[in-house]
Amino acid sequence: MALPGVTKLLLLPGVRAQLLNTPVRLSHWATPGRCTKSCHAYLQKNLRFCTTRSFSSVSPAAESSEDTVLKWLLLLIPVATFSLGTWQVQRRSWKLKLIQEMEARVSGKPIPLTTDPMEIKELEYRPVKVRGHFDHSKELYILPRTLVDPEREAREAGQLASNTQSGAQVITPFYCSDLGITILVNRGFVPKKKVNPETRPKGQVSGEVELVGIVRLNETRKPFVPHNDPSRNLWHYKDLSAMAQVVGAEPILIDADRGSTVPGGPIGGQTRVTLRNEHMQYIVTWYGLCAATTYLWCKKFIRKVAL
């Protein structure tokens, strides 16, 4: 006679082995009527012990091994975030030093412009002086651009809204009489309504002039920045080779300083001497994650508190 709930349990190896090794008195099975009740009670008692022993027989060594692996794997998180935070500290120090060097170069004494391409590369952000005259008939326009005004930016620092206006930077061929070559000069910023040179005739300087400018190098097109369109005289980034080819000049560019500004003309001094420096934010982020994950790791594996 099959007993309810017994058949399946008897199939378990641990239960079957336990029953085979358990002595049973024959008197319990002698009487047919008594056999069923006695057998049922006996099996329930012994099966409860066997199943408990069977299901609780997971190796403690296996559990300990799994916990150890998990423990050291999770420890990699605070270690990695601490390393990234330290790396950002080093990057910030390097960036601050680079900014200081750039500011020192810009504030240096103007030197004569050289025509050697290798020397030009070493002169980026260095002020140079040139003498010659402009060819306003071949102006190029880099747009859209906003006015670089350090004083206004300092006043509006921290404000949600600013009075920045959109416009363009005017690139004009400049024949250097002392060098015998034509270079490119970024005369400065004009608002959008003044891009057309006919709207600013007083600002079109004629005759030989002497000016000071900052040497600038070629720009690389950034993601999402439109391509230049030389046929329409639309430039979105400084491609010196293409610009020089269009106007017949050398691929040398200087940004005229603010002292070169004339009434009605472009506003000079549009060199922004700054570099993106967000390393402090990254430092706080990585070290914050390191502190949080270290706390959770110690709570879990040192203090043995369930998370």
Swiss-Prot record:
The keyword Mitochondrion applies. It comes from the Eukaryota. Disulfide bonds: none annotated. Signal peptide: none annotated. The keyword Membrane applies. Pfam families: SURF1. PROSITE patterns: SURF1 (PS50895). One of its GO terms (cellular component) is mitochondrial inner membrane. Keywords: Membrane, Mitochondrion, Mitochondrion inner membrane, Transmembrane, Transmembrane helix. The chain crosses the membrane at residues 69-87, 282-302. One of its GO terms (biological process) is mitochondrial cytochrome c oxidase assembly. It is found in: Mitochondrion inner membrane. May play a role in mitochondrial respiratory chain complex IV assembly. Probably involved in the biogenesis of the COX complex. Belongs to the SURF1 family. PANTHER family: SURFEIT LOCUS PROTEIN (PTHR23427), SURFEIT LOCUS PROTEIN 1 (PTHR23427:SF2). This is Surfeit locus protein 1.
